[in-house]
Structures are given as C-alpha cells and as structure tokens.
Amino acid sequence: MEGAHLVEAASGRGLVREVFVTEVAAPRHAALLDRQDATVNLVTERAAKALSDTVTPAGLVAVCEPPAADLDDVLADKPALIAAGVHISEPGNAGTLIRIADATGAAAVIFGGHCVDPYNGKCLRASAGSIFSIPVVIEPDAAKAVTVLRAAGLQVLATTVDGEMSLDDADLARPTAWLFGPESQGLPANVADLADHRVHIPMRGGAESLNVAAAAAICLYQSARSLR
C-alpha cells in the first residue's frame, strides 16, 4: 500500500511488515516512521516509482498483512448492520462501499461472487483507511452468504430498481444485511431472490439508477438512523 494515511491506518492495527521510503519523503514522515516496529528501508526515487501504482508516487510504500476476517466471527457478535457487495468489479466503488459502511457503523462488509480484490491499490485509497477499521469478508459464493446471513437472524434486503418494497416502507429497526450489485447489471436474480425483500430507492428526478456507492450511502444511513 502507498501513502502516509494508509500506512498510518495499517500500523495502528499492527499489520505493517516492511516499509520503503525515499530520502526525500523520509523527513516528511519522520514521526510515522519512528513509530514503526517493522523494518524501514531507504530506497531510490526510481525504486519507489516501480513500487507505486499511482501517477505521482508518494515515496512511502508498505508491505502489510491483510487483516483476518471470517463471517462466522462477525455473526457471533450479533451484528445489527452488514453491507454486502455482489459482483463489484470497480475498485473505486468497492473502496467507497467499505468507507461508507465504516462511517455508518456497519459491523462488516462482505464481497460476494466475482468481486475486485479489496486490497487493490485503488480500492485501498478509495476506502481512505477504513479497510483497516472494519472486517472485510470475501465469500466467492454470494448465494451461500445470503443463506448464512438469514440463518443468523438478519433480514436481508436486496437493492433493485424494480423492488416490490420502497425504502420508505422497509422495517430498518431490525438487524439488516444490505445487498448491493453493480449499477450496470444489478444483483444476480439467484441472489436477489434469496433476500427477504427486494427494495427500491424512490427517485423523483430523471435518474433511473444509482451506482453502488450512492445506493449504499442512502440505505446504510437510513438503517443506521433507525437503529439508534
């Protein structure tokens, strides 16, 4: 991962294993580097550029251990709110979903089906460090995840443009797991059909749909508000 904000977030969880920094960047991040238990290596600008996946390298890169996250452990704590992204391939949307879930107090984020790697560089940056603050569970079988969530006592709500229930009418005071699919294809039918309800977000303007991040922000905020 790259940049002071992400390295700071990961080091707070004890996940940093090795740090690479240029001579130019080292003085700017002296306090952060001094707090590291991991090995800190000085590297050339050329090496830093090779390690970077951004147009303008930050000069600070860390190798980290992904935090362990297991769905059974998440459910053992009787969560009130979970966000699940299904077939989310765009890293910016995936990272923003993590950030929104963290901001609204969700207990975890689940990525089901063929999703982008949540530790992709763009996804990490979009999460703004929240990926180290909230459990992120990867479950290739999205239908299985829905079944497990319902068995644990959560109502599962699938966001769809043609849902039979309006968000305004949903009972969000109950423990809830939200399902979000990509804007272009939506949720797979075999996954949406397993949910307790298919929910649509009322829209008054000319927009026909919302992307994952926008839909998640609305639905998770509404749930968090009802659960207060």
Summary of predicted features, one role per range:
Residues 4, 24-25, 47, 67-68, ...:
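Short glycine-rich anion-binding loops that position phosphate/pyrophosphate groups of nucleotides
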Residues 1-55:
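N-terminal positively charged helical leader segments and presequences
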Residues 69, 75-163:
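RNA substrate-binding interface of SAM-dependent RNA methyltransferases
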Residues 62, 100-104, 118-131, 189-228:
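Structured adenosyl-cofactor binding patch, chiefly the S-adenosyl-L-methionine
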Residues 3, 89-97, 210-215:
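Amphipathic alpha-helical repeat scaffolds
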Residues 21-25, 65, 87:
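Structural motif
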Residues 157-207, 211:
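Active-site/ligand-binding-proximal alpha/beta "capping" segment
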